[in-house]
Structures are given as structure tokens and as C-alpha cells.
């Protein structure tokens, strides 16, 4: 017998009417994305006086996400990334309303973070660059979308893997694993696309700097990668009751 689809659960009406935690979760996402942009984008903000190194940017983003995940993961899941939120939505692990609210506050937090950077350092730095996402002139638009999709795919697979409730073999720190996947994505692709992996991270600086050239790439690429990763994990990799855990890794 086919199970009847509960549209109210899919839409998520109860997330607003009955969930008293939703406002704490939204505040956590807003603050988390704010600090991701302040610290992460702040690390790639350069001017005529200096230029940040690739390892500096990569590990700043990775360690910032790992730190925030440890701090607010128990409250909101620490998505702080619309692509991650869409990944949870597409496999039915978040409602539509809750996902829209998450993405909205993530974007607000990103704008606020970028604005703080601009206000805080614009007087001290000439030729201020807020780390607006852009891709190499040697790439086509399609290649840029593909690269963003691939590096976000890795991020979301790691997020789904470390948060899989069926796993008993997880060792080490889940937040650190997520952070390292972000650092790896930056080390791989920062010279190619800027390694956004996060539409909100690109949206905040774009709003504050009013720079929109090919901005859509940084929504489409990460979201496509997140959707593919989430679907693959749910239908192929997810641990199910009765799975043989003897195949789990052991160091």
C-alpha cells in the first residue's frame, strides 16, 4: 500500500505553529552565516597593500565552519549555506517553509557580515576587494558551474555522512571533517572559481559591492552539486537497518 503523503508536513506548517525552537534555529543560522562571512570572507579581503595567500583563505574558511558547527550544530544543524539546506530539503529531511526561512536568514547574515567588513576596513585599505566571487577568464561559464557543483558535492556528501544516524563507526570530529572538506575545496578550486561552495557567501559581498557579473553561477553550481550529493547519499550510501557494519572502516 502506498503511504499517503502528508502535504502539511512537506510544507512545514507545524515548523511555525508548533515548533518553539524555530526562532533559536533561525537566529543560530543568521549569526553563524554572519561570522562565516566576517571571518572567512575577511581572510580573502585584500587591497593594493597586500594579497592573502591561498592556504590562508582555505584554512580560515575550513576552521571557521568547523568551529561554528561545534558551537551551533546542536541548535540548527549549522547549515550556514543555502546549498546544504536545499540538500536536506530535496531528500525530505527539512520542510519547505523551514528551508525558505533558513535560506533567508543565511542571506541576511551574509549581507550583514560583508557590510561589517566594508565598514570596518574600507578606510584603512585602498582598492578594497570584498572577496566577491568570480571565476577565471580561462574558464567557460559551464566549466565554472561544474567546478562549483563538484566541490560542493564533496562538502554535502561529508555533511550527510557524518550526520547519518545509522552509522556507528564514526570516529574523530564531525565538525572538523566538514571543515576539512571546505578547506580542500578551496585549495583545489580557489584559483579557478574562487571556491564559493556557498551561495550566501557569494551573495553577501555581491550585495554590498553591487557586483553581479555571473553571480548566478554561485547559486546554480553549489545547489546542483548539493542536490546530487544528497540524493546519492540517501538512495545509495545511507546506512539502513540490517546493513553489515563489518565493512566500516577501522584504523
Curated annotation (Swiss-Prot):
Subunit structure: Homotetramer.
Originating species: Haematobia irritans exigua
Role this protein plays: Forms a water-specific channel.
Motif NPA 1 mapped to chain: 81-83
Stated family: Belongs to the MIP/aquaporin (TC 1.A.8) family.
Keywords from the named record: Membrane, Repeat, Transmembrane, Transmembrane helix, Transport
Pfam family, one: MIP
Record topology, Extracellular segments: 47-56, 121-138, 191-211
Membrane topology: Multi-pass membrane protein
PROSITE patterns named in the record: MIP
GO cellular component assignments: plasma membrane
Ranges facing Cytoplasmic side: 1-26, 78-99, 160-169, 233-251
Domain notes: Aquaporins contain two tandem repeats each containing three membrane-spanning domains and a pore-forming loop with the signature motif Asn-Pro-Ala (NPA).
Protein name per the record: Aquaporin
Gene3D superfamilies according to UniProt: Glycerol uptake facilitator protein
MF terms (GO), sorted A to Z: channel activity
Residue span of motif NPA 2: 198-200
Record's subcellular location: Membrane
Transmembrane segments: 27-46, 57-77, 100-120, 139-159, 170-190, 212-232
